[in-house]
Amino acid sequence: MSSLLEQLIEAFRVLPGVGQKSAQRMAYHVLEREREGGRRLATTLANAVEKVGHCVQCRDFTESEICTICASSSRDRQQLCVVESPADRLAIEHATGYRGLYFVLQGRLSPLDGIGPRELGLDRLGERLAAGEVTEMIIATNATVEGEATAHYLAQLARQHAVRPSRLAQGMPLGGELEYVDRGTLSHAFGTRSEVL
């Protein structure tokens, strides 16, 4: 196998969920059938790596200093939704009518992996809360051990700045049937049930 082909296969392996076989299939596909697509991919990837950075206010991906959401005058500046990743921000933006601002952690607290408050930009988040414009922090971290630890830390940070923390509801999926829901989810949903209004 040629050295360039091996390098291409290894390059594809940096993508999440792509193992040796998938990377090999992708490399062969690009070289056998999609050379023009491969050139376009290479050019676009190089441009994105060079030009896409982080918004100075929310840490989401952007090509400018401030992203379009933070720059928008139509957003509610009193609400701040904290998410783990740009993909989480996009999911909320597409699935809800949320009109507030965001703060993207780019991860979650994980001391064993060397990810602490500094790596998540929580000093910048603290400064933003201290400015006094935000009145509610919506904590939208994942329901994992690290996500829950991060949510707890965020709630404490919000309270230190007299900001009301709230957490996304968790539990039964819409349209889900009880018999198919796992025990942990069902237990959590039952324990955090709310009054029907």
UniProtKB/Swiss-Prot annotation:
InterPro entries: DNA_Rcmb_RecR, Rcmb_RecR, Rcmb_RecR_Znf, TOPRIM_dom, TOPRIM_RecR. Disulfide bonds: none annotated. One of its GO terms (molecular function) is zinc ion binding. SMART domains: TOPRIM. It comes from the Bacteria. A zinc finger (C4-type) spans 55-70. PANTHER family: RECOMBINATION PROTEIN RECR. This is Recombination protein RecR.
